[in-house]
Each structure stands twice: as structure tokens, then as C-alpha cells.
Amino acid sequence: MEEHTEAGSAPEMGAQKALIDNPADILVIAAYFLLVIGVGLWSMCRTNRGTVGGYFLAGRSMVWWPVGASLFASNIGSGHFVGLAGTGAASGLAVAGFEWNALFVVLLLGWLFAPVYLTAGVITMPQYLRKRFGGRRIRLYLSVLSLFLYIFTKISVDMFSGAVFIQQALGWNIYASVIALLGITMIYTVTGGLAALMYTDTVQTFVILGGACILMGYAFHEVGGYSGLFDKYLGAATSLTVSEDPAVGNISSFCYRPRPDSYHLLRHPVTGDLPWPALLLGLTIVSGWYWCSDQVIVQRCLAGKSLTHIKAGCILCGYLKLTPMFLMVMPGMISRILYPDEVACVVPEVCRRVCGTEVGCSNIAYPRLVVKLMPNGLRGLMLAVMLAALMSSLASIFNSSSTLFTMDIYTRLRPRAGDRELLLVGRLWVVFIVVVSVAWLPVVQAAQGGQLFDYIQAVSSYLAPPVSAVFVLALFVPRVNEQGAFWGLIGGLLMGLARLIPEFSFGSGSCVQPSACPAFLCGVHYLYFAIVLFFCSGLLTLTVSLCTAPIPRKHLHRLVFSLRHSKEEREDLDADEQQGSSLPVQNGCPESAMEMNEPQAPAPSLFRQCLLWFCGMSRGGVGSPPPLTQEEAAAAARRLEDISEDPSWARVVNLNALLMMAVAVFLWGFYA
């Protein structure tokens, strides 16, 4: 047992802040923001933002490399920098399995799911289920669930992670910094639409990878190279192991020594912190929900100009997903080696002084490396990287939640809303999300940081598997109907809540102060629970479907995988609703078909014209495309739903997919 060091000599949170107050850092940060704003303005000028398809799907004009870069940048938020590095510092390499699992799942998106979404002619995922099953309750349920998850989990994680970095690296006021960050993000999200997001995502992907590569180089140099990491990590333990609290006292070495299996991706199926069956199967289920049916991700794919470009973008994203192991997880482990008394603190009162929370300070691993290792200028670059990740992730949530609310909820309230009204509501929803985000900041700041990364994974495991099951069955089992899908979702939700509510009521605890949640409620690993929940939801869906009337085949053409190439006319189950509405976009028709006949208004003033252009709502004028005829609109709709591929390029992307899977299998085996 280590000797107790005097509490007063423990590192203080305030003593280790490195303020960005030198000209080099400020210049780099300013240049970065000018670059992002410039790219956003450029995309505003060159893209069509005045229509629903142009704003929400970038007009289906994106080539493969911005699609892939945007998929990666939308997925990699500041939560990855803080969370992956922090979990790597705490338990070793296994957390990289969350990233490398996605290599295979993103291929499922490009090859199996995206073709059906395209031929269905949809903008949102609940909209697909509305076409597939009919009825309103599934679509409304998924829209509300998705918005709930966006606001209270994704935004929470990004906000907390950004706050940790700002606290540790800058010393700025948290609220002023995050509000300014949200403001800039909101400006180019509200004004630019999806095309602006995808172009800025592409720029930020290079910023993220470049800055993280530089820090990785500094970190490996400091620790003595790749071999130095694996030689020293198992000995990286804090010297502060005795608490002043008599209830805690001497802390067991089990709580502050690195795990013996820290270097293994695949761990013991019972005693491992990430059991290998759960990592391979349970994580695939949760990842399937995120990569194949989550609005943030799928919306990027639907913007690809062709199915081949979509597949190539998925491959590029997969290759980029190889990098977090080396750019985030291993630097987090190095941070524990270099600063064990801070990053690996275990005494509650010491941890509170170091990072403000008692359960541990592994979340400061990445910010600590930036503060300690990076020289002036490069430290500003790394701040820009973190801001890029945070802004990209938040902007994705803002845009996608705006799409969900506008197309799936608002059109239920105002079925005859015109194109301009929908665009205005979509932008106002973004403003509302920003207000909610800022109001949520005190809750995020008060949360125990050591539990936040596990929190987001656990919440996903309790709520996502029923959605995954329904989407898989919807695409691949034509016999599944609306009753089965709805009751499968509801039954799965009740099962998930039965695990989620007691676990978070009791708290997840820590090694020093374990949770009081009974083992029969909380003892099963959350990824194992995801497997059980997935199969129970799927079984309930199939059982109810087989006991009720099937959906006639005439309603399923190009809505299930086996009928994706069908040329027969489809009778949409939501046709009656669409005929009563003036919104052909709900049937996949192009945005121009949505224009409503409105009385001719007097010419707006110059100020009003500028304001309408800035918000992407101007009509007519120089450079505006003429309205499409009915024949042109039908041709555009067919192009949006086209999944034909050039055979030679199809073979190229297929071979690249096989190559990427081979690389992934090798890396899994090497680190298993």
C-alpha cells in the first residue's frame, strides 16, 4: 500500500490551467474561426438552401469524399477526445473496440440500408417507417424518442466534454465560452443547411486529424515511443492512496492499479469490464442503431449524389475510424503514465481538488496532454481541433433534429404548411435547441464526469436495441407489419426503462464507493442487456406480426431489401394523408413540387432581401433557378430515388470494402 501524501500537496485544479493568452495561440484560433465562417459563407452562395431538399439533404449533390469526411466528423465529437482518452487512461485499449466495430457496421449502411432508404424516397428515418408500415404512431414515437436522445444525451456529452477541455486548458468562463461556441455553430447551421455542414465538416476533419496527429507525436516522444507506452502503462499508479475520510481509509490496489488485461481488446466474458461477446455482438446491435437508422448519420448518406458515392463515403469513414485508437486511446494511456497523481487519482477528496468530481479524473487525460506538452501556437491548434469536434457534432444534431421536428412533427400539426413556413420553423427549432442546450449546462456541469462516457453508452444500450430490431425486420422481413413493429417498440421500451430507471436512481458508483443497485437489476453488463433486449423486441415484433394481417405486396415495392429493384407501381400506405396534404416531399418528390400558390407580394426592401438571402429563404432574383415543370419535377424525383451503379466503379468500391475489412480483421486479431 502506498503512503498517503499530505492532502495539501495534492495537485490543485486551478494551479494547472494554461491560459491561451499568447499571440501565436490567439492567431491560430482566429484563423480557424475565419476559415470555418468563410467556408460556411461560400457554401451559402453556391448551394440551394431555399428548398426543403436543398436545406435538409444538400440536394443529393455531394460526392464521396465530403460524405465520408462528414460521416466521420459528425461521429467524432469532443466526447470522443475526452471520453476515449479518459477510458483509455482508466482501463486500456478495449474502448477502441467501440470505434473499430463501426468499420463493419458502416458498410452495412452503405450496402444494405442506404439503397432501401433511397428507393423509398425519404428524408427522415421515422418517415421511412411511416411508408413501410403506415399509421402515425411509430413515426411519432421515433421522432420524439430521437429528439429526447439528441437533447439530453448527445448534447449533454458534447457540452460536458467541451466544458472539461475549456476548464483544464483555458480557464475561461464556461458559460460565456460555450454560449459563444453555440452561437457560431447556430449561425452557419441556420443559414447554410446541410451543404454548409458537410463542407465545414470536411474542413474540420482535416483540422481534427492534423492536430490530433501532432499531439500523438509529442505524447509518444515524451513516453519513449510505442514500446515505452507498453512498458510503462501497467506501472502507472497514483501515489495518493489513503483517504482522510475514515469511511474510505486505505484504498485497495485493485482500484488504482491498471487492469492486467489493459493491452487486450477482447476480455474475459464474465470478469472483463468490456466482455468480448458483449463487445462483438451487443455493441454491433447498438452501433447498428447509430450508423444505420440514426438521423444524424443516415442524413449524410442520403445526400450522396449516387449509391456508388455513398458506398465510397462509407469506406472512407471506415478507414478514418481506424485512427481513434492511435490518436485518442493511446494518448490517454500515455497521459496516465506522465501524470498519474492527476489522471489516475483515486482518493475522492484529491480528485475533487484536481478536476472537481470525486469519482475520478481520467476525463482530463487529453486536456492535460495539450496543456503540458504542446508549445504556443500548437496549443491553439489543439483548441481549434476541440472546437471543431464540438461544433461539428452540435451542428449535426441541430440540423438533424430540425429535420425531424419539421418533417415528422410540425407537418402533423400544420399539414398544409408551405415550403417557406417549413424552412422558417426548421430554423426556429435550431434556435430553440440552442436555448435548451444552454439551460442544460448546469445539469451537465454538476454530473459526475467519471460516469458520463459510460452513461451515454448505457442509455443507448437500454433504448436503442428495440429500434435496431424494428429497422432490421422492416428492411429484411416483408411479413412484419405495423402492429408488430409498434408493440415491439413499446415492449422493448418498457424492458429498457425497467433497467435504466433503477440503475440511474442508485447511481453507477465507483471502485472506491460501489453502487447500491441490487445485482439482479444492475449486475448484467449493459451490452449483454442490449443483446437480450434486441432479441426480445424482435421476437415480440415477429409474434404480433404473424398473429395479425400481413401488408399486401403492392405496398412494399422498393421499401424492403428484396424488392429494392422492383419497377412496379407502389401504393403508399400513407397515400391518403399525402393526397390531403400539399406536401409531396413526404412521398419523396423534389422540393420544387412543394411550392404553394401564394398571392403576389410587393417587392421587399433591400434590407429584407439581404435578410432573406442570409436565411436561405429568398425567392427569385439573380441566380435563382426557375421553377420546375411537372415533368421536370417527376424526373428529379426519379433521380433522387435512383440506385443504379456503373459496374466498373461498383467493383472498385466492393474491392475496397473487402480490403478495409481485411485490415480491420488484422488489427482486431493483433490487439485481441
Curated annotation (Swiss-Prot):
An example molecular function term from Gene Ontology annotations: D-glucose:sodium symporter activity
One CC-aspect GO term: membrane
Catalytic activity from the UniProt record: D-glucose(out) + Na(+)(out) = D-glucose(in) + Na(+)(in)
Protein name: Sodium/glucose cotransporter 2
UniProt cross-references to InterPro entries, sorted A to Z: Na/Glc_symporter_sf, Na/solute_symporter, Na/solute_symporter_CS
GO biological process, one term: carbohydrate metabolic process
Species name: Homo sapiens
Top-level lineage group: Eukaryota
Regulation of catalytic or functional activity: Enhanced by the interaction with PDZK1IP1/MAP17. Inhibited by natural product phlorizin and diabetic drugs, including empagliflozin and dapagliflozin, canagliflozin, and sotagliflozin. Empagliflozin is selective for SLC5A2/SGLT2 over SLC5A1/SGLT1 and it inhibits by occupying the sugar-binding site in SLC5A2.
Mutagenesis / variant outcome for changing V157A: Decreases D-glucose transporter activity. Impairs inhibition by empagliflozin on glucose uptake
